[in-house]
C-alpha cells in the first residue's frame, strides 16, 4: 500500500471541490482532489435529464471562465458538467479520479488525519 502526504485533501471533484481547488491554488496551498468517479459525475448521471442550473450562466460561472451558452440562459446539466471539467483543466486542478475515500482517522502522532482510499 502506498503512502503520500498533502497539506489539504479535498474529497469530491464536483462544483465545490473544483472551486476549493481554485482557491487553494490561488493561495499557494498544496492540495489534492480525489473523486471516486469522474469530475462532475453527479451532474451527469444523478440528475434528471431536464435539469438546468438554478441561475443564469452569468451568475453561476466561476472566475475567469464563461459558460458556452448565452449569459442569461440556464445551462443544462450536461453543459454544467462539461463546464466543470473544462474549468478543472483550465486551472490545472490536481484531481485524481477513480479514487474513493474509504476511511478517515485522526492522526495521534501529529496534527492531521490519516486517509485511506481505494488507491492506498
Tell what function each PLM region has:
Residues 4-33:
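N-terminal Rossmann-like FAD-binding beta1-loop-alpha1 element of flavoenzymes
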Residues 11-14, 35, 63, 97:
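A secondary-structure boundary/capping signal
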Residues 16, 38-39:
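Conserved Rossmann-like nucleotide-cofactor binding loop
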Amino acid at each position: 500500500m502506498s503512502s503520500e502526504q498533502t497539506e489539504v485533501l479535498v474529497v469530491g471533484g464536483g462544483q465545490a471541490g473544483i472551486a476549493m481547488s481554485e482557491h487553494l491554488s490561488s493561495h499557494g496551498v498544496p492540495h489534492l482532489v480525489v473523486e471516486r468517479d469522474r469530475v462532475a459525475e453527479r451532474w451527469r448521471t444523478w440528475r434528471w435529464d431536464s435539469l438546468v442550473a438554478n441561475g443564469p450562466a452569468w451568475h453561476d460561472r466561476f472566475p475567469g471562465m464563461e459558460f458556452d451558452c448565452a449569459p442569461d440562459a440556464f445551462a443544462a446539466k450536461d453543459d454544467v458538467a462539461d463546464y466543470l471539467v473544462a474549468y478543472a483543466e483550465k486551472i490545472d486542478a490536481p484531481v485524481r479520479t477513480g479514487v474513493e475515500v474509504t476511511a478517515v482517522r485522526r492522526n495521534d502522532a501529529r496534527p492531521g488525519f490519516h486517509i485511506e482510499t481505494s488507491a492506498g
